[in-house]
Amino acid sequence: MLQWIKNFSIPLIYLSFLLLWLYYAIFSASYLALLGFVFLLVCLFIQFPWKSAGKVLIICGIFGFWFVFQNWQQSQASQNLADSVERVRILPDTIKVNGDSLSFRGKSNGRAFQVYYKLQSEEEKEAFQALTDLHEIGLEGKLSEPEGQRNFGGFNYQAYLKTQGIYQTLNIKTIQSLQKIGSWDIGENLSSLRRKAVVWIKTHFPDPMRNYMTGLLLGHLDTDFEEMNELYSSLGIIHLFALSGMQVGFFMNGFKKLLLRLGLTQEKLKWLTYPFSLIYAGLTGFSASVIRSLLQKLLAQHGVKGLDNFALTVLVLFIVMPNFFLTAGGVLSCAYAFILTMTSKEGEGLKAVTSESLVISLGILPILSFYFAEFQPWSILLTFVFSFLFDLTFLPLLSILFVLS
């Protein structure tokens, strides 16, 4: 792989940057992005030999076809909607109970739905709160399209669900049956396993410890976190509950150290990290930041580091997660990783860490302002302090408590 990267016509970071403009030109139908892509192509042919630039153009054509195909598929899916649904398979880790309101994501005939239901009794509420295995619901309900953007600059719920592969919502009127089922689908089984971990934490740990534990270990923040969510949002540090490279690094390094102590060789360990990464990604709900970080870790195992590592990660994400850069989480995750790659230097001590933290916080500011239109100045200092507290103290302690429980 390293030899292929060295022999490539242009630096990989140039290629990923070029494809990013093409990506937004197609998925967002942006004339500005298309103009930027054409301008970069002209610069490419000016700066590099025509033979090298021609190879890059062919690669752009292949990725462009892939982007157009994915965009067409999504367009077709949004037009060919289901007329009715009688049975839905529940994805357990998406279950949320808020008062007498139940919501979850479900599958039926290869389609995904966001499902809502008004609970009829306290017994029914407790049953869904404790539900961990895969179940299929027989129901009578009404399908509808999600709400779009209500006002200028407001949250577009329809666009968000589209990035998750969901084009319709289902409001259940009556539940006719609830049947436990089995499945060979890895994603569904990991969803069930994650739900079991969440329910275990909720039933064995007090509040607010359980919120910290589910948030930092599993990337799951439930409805009972809302009051704390408002507090952390006002302080500008709610993003610390989003799983990041620090958590991924902690668990990956812990997994490697454990297996090395058991006597495994580095070569065998390298290949065992692949199934571990899949399981860990599933236990965190296939979070955008976790998948990005895991890809970078796996590529680093094969000697791909620095900007080449970041660029190759972006190329892989274009293929395996075409909607990655259409979400705020995906963009912010890659922006953090890019700034960290560009600014990380050999240095030790508090001064180096403080400097790096300040650069990252200021570097990400334009993107945070674009997506959320707000910024708390003191969040830079609080992020620096609390990131150490969360990742170096809370994360190890909560992990130990969870394992011992």
What are these regions (language model features)?
Residues 30-42, 332-333, 383-391:
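Alpha-helical transmembrane segments of polytopic membrane proteins
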Residues 188, 234, 370-385, 396-405:
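Membrane-interface amphipathic/re-entrant loop segments adjacent to transmembrane helices
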Residues 39-60, 170, 228-380:
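Hydrophobic alpha-helical transmembrane segments in multi-pass membrane proteins
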Residues 5, 22-34, 325, 350, ...:
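Membrane-helix interface and helix-disruption motif detector
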